[in-house]
Amino acid sequence: DDHDDGANWKASTQVGGNPRGSMSYDDWKSLHFKGEEIIDPSVSGPSVDPDKDGLNNFAEYALGTVPTNNINTIPFPKLLFAQQGEEKYLFIEFTRAQGERDARFLVQTSSDLKDWENKAIQLGPESLDPNGNIITRYRFPDPINEENQTPGFLRLFITD
């Protein structure tokens, strides 16, 4: 098939799909850094935060934000409490740019901030915000119980 002919195109089976496959961290670096910055780990290394916005380069890569501009068009992950049926739950919502990247998003739960498990429950399918970014929502598996006040925590863990 001729991929330059729009008649041969079809909708992606994934929200944010990319016909070229996933973007590597090195490809992303070459888009956002210039010359010596690309090979300087103190500027473009995965754990560095050159724009001082609280997101290191790997998180910026995974979420699709710009590492040299601290005014992000994609909001930071947010925690909120919401009612689901008769119960109240802790939720996390995060947004990322479309396109495949070599990164995984794990929403993890903990009762002590030491031991983390992949037990969060995804709520519905991913959706798109008005800018075309992908929104994903998870909730803590157990409802918030006013009586026993067992602590519960959620975090977004981004890994390769």
Task: Locate predicted features.
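Acidic side chains
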Residues: 1-5, 49-53, 112, 142, ...
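Acidic, glycine/proline-rich Ca2+-coordinating loop motifs
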Residues: 24-27, 51, 64, 69, ...
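Residue-level preference for well-ordered alpha-helical positions
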Residues: 29-33, 60, 108
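Extracytoplasmic/periplasmic, Sec-exported soluble proteins
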Residues: 46-51, 99
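Glycine-aliphatic tripeptides that mark coil-to-beta-strand junctions in extracellular
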Residues: 50-58, 62
